[in-house]
Amino acid sequence: MERMNDNVLTLQMLCAEQGMEIDLPTLQQLARYGDCLERWNHKINLISRKEDAPVIIKHIFHSLLITLYHSFREGEDVLDLGTGGGLPGIPLSLLFPRTRFLLVDATGKKIAACQAMITELGINNAIALHTRVEELKGVVFDTVLSRQVAPLDKLCSYSAPLLKAGGTLICLKGGNLENEIAAAMKSNKGQEGFPSKVELHPIHGISPFFSEKQIVIVHGKNSSANND
């Protein structure tokens, strides 16, 4: 219980520093998710087992930083592509209970863990589905999220047919992305002009644990920055 309270206070402080006001019940749910994630990680490999930062910072707070650049709306349909242990989809689903999240991953054990965590946390606006993204048919989304390490051009090719007109791809990535962005822009001819614009938002100033991290926002022809 003491560790849970420490995680709640840590997350509350970090979010407040970024102007993110989150009520106590939601902070407690986010901390519970962190505990679930660590517990499941002992069973299957969801996140690195050689952590250099607390899970509440490196994974959960990191996921929440997307909200600095994107306002999730009521009724918005969001795809979490390659969700792994539910990141960033589960933290964001807790923060935005009126937004719909679909979490997909090609590894069945990871999705089973996500389903168990969603059930344990009582989340009713997120579904975890075991599938390959190429097999998603007949569905489109307002926003696609990804925290996986795939190159940006591949993430764009996966996302283009799954995004509604004006939709946006948001990635959490690290390192020098110059070559990845160039490759993604070169590939847009066969993807109805997606991407037409790529924004980079470094977050190294927020925490030393994010020294090389950036939030990448990829727009199509008809999309615009959604940070109202």
UniProtKB/Swiss-Prot annotation:
The EC code for this enzyme is 2.1.1.-
Q: Which UniProt keywords apply?
A: Cytoplasm, Methyltransferase, rRNA processing, S-adenosyl-L-methionine, Transferase
List the Pfam families hit by this protein, alphabetically. Answer: GidB (PF02527)
Location in the cell: Cytoplasm
Q: What is its main location?
A: cytoplasm
The entry's cellular-component GO terms read: cytosol
The UniProt entry, under PANTHER family, shows: S-ADENOSYL-L-METHIONINE-DEPENDENT METHYLTRANSFERASES SUPERFAMILY PROTEIN (PTHR31760:SF0)
Q: Known NCBIfam families for this protein?
A: rsmG_gidB
Kindly provide the name given to this protein in its UniProt entry.
Answer: Ribosomal RNA small subunit methyltransferase G
Record gene name: rsmG
